[in-house]
Amino acid sequence: MENITNVYIVEDESIVAKDIQNSLKKLGYNVLGISNNGADAIKNIVDLEPHIVLMDIMIKGPLTGIDVAEKIKKEYNIPVIFLTAYADESTLSKAKITEPYGYILKPFKEIDLHSTIEMAIYKHKKDTEIQKERDFLYSLVDNKDETAKDILFVKSNSRLVKVNLKDIFFD
């Protein structure tokens, strides 16, 4: 069975939000919801746990899309793609600090939306795998347990592979 990607949209213009929703459904994505402001977006994203968030930069309320994206990245590890009409240097400088998984200028083509989402989902998956591996390695370094001394790491295909020496050498 194919996994369906769950998407959350943060867009303050309802017509644009509906257009994005229709495009996503046509492309085979599941839209969990739409918010037009930062506070609602954060609450719903926490509750619904989407795979990815499409974020307008200029939204209603005191929080910008950049503020919301920064919070989502720091606290919830959900990838964000900006969908915006703004490409000035100031906006780009602020947006890139949040390390978005994409930046699409409006108006956009469905193929651009689709390819950016697919690349972002793949990159986020790989980033998560690398982080888990890194966390595991740090836990071994911090581990004062005797079992850690019997573990060897071998580089294989640009990845570290854990080998338990007790499985290789027999006493």
Task: Describe each region flagged by the PLM.
Residues M1-T5, D145-A148:
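Extreme N-terminus of proteins, especially the signal/transit-peptide cleavage junction
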Residues N3, G28-V31, E49, N77, ...:
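Short loop/turn motifs at secondary-structure junctions
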Residues S23-K26, N44, I72, K94, ...:
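A general structural signal for stabilizing positions within well-ordered secondary structure
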Residues E2-I9, E13-G38, K43:
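Two-component/phosphorelay signaling modules centered on CheY-like receiver
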Residues K132-D171:
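Conserved binding/recognition cores within well-folded domains
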Residues K43-D47, H51-F136:
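CheY-like receiver
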Residues V31, I52, G102, D167-F170:
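Residues at the N-termini of beta-strands
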Residues Y8, F82, F169-D171:
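Short, hydrophobic/aromatic-rich beta-strand segments within well-structured domains
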